[in-house]
């Protein structure tokens, strides 16, 4: 399986979710299944079937997280030599030359991406266009809404 790039924060969030699923959610579901079994006939027991469905989702998510963590390539951008280039994990401030709007993004792994928090996936059109660029570079990025021209104002390794 291919290495999955993620930041330290992203790996920690996945570990926290895994711990929660294993230590809290899994026991809750097991208890719900046991309680539903006590109600008798399992064929027409909606509580039992709902709990079993939850168990399937929970176990699937646990396996998914474990696979991602085992294949994770955790990158601590603060330990990278700062050569001023946009790399995975970097925080980049850009100026949209069409709208004069300034925006700051952090380039993260797919699981960490949250556009509302300005965390963009390394595989997004914006990140792909910015990777390798330096401060003062101008780049045209093809987005679903059309071509957008950005100027890189600042590159930080936070």
From Swiss-Prot:
Record-linked PROSITE patterns: GREAB_1, GREAB_2
Domain of life where this protein originates: Bacteria
GO biological process: DNA-templated transcription elongation; regulation of DNA-templated transcription elongation
Keywords: DNA-binding, Transcription, Transcription regulation
GO molecular function: DNA binding; RNA polymerase binding
Record keyword Transmembrane helix present: no
Family: Belongs to the GreA/GreB family.
Function: Necessary for efficient RNA polymerase transcription elongation past template-encoded arresting sites. The arresting sites in DNA have the property of trapping a certain fraction of elongating RNA polymerases that pass through, resulting in locked ternary complexes. Cleavage of the nascent transcript by cleavage factors such as GreA or GreB allows the resumption of elongation from the new 3'terminus. GreA releases sequences of 2 to 3 nucleotides.
HAMAP family: GreA_GreB
Protein's name according to its UniProt entry: Transcription elongation factor GreA
Originating organism: Salmonella typhimurium (strain LT2 / SGSC1412 / ATCC 700720)
Gene label: greA
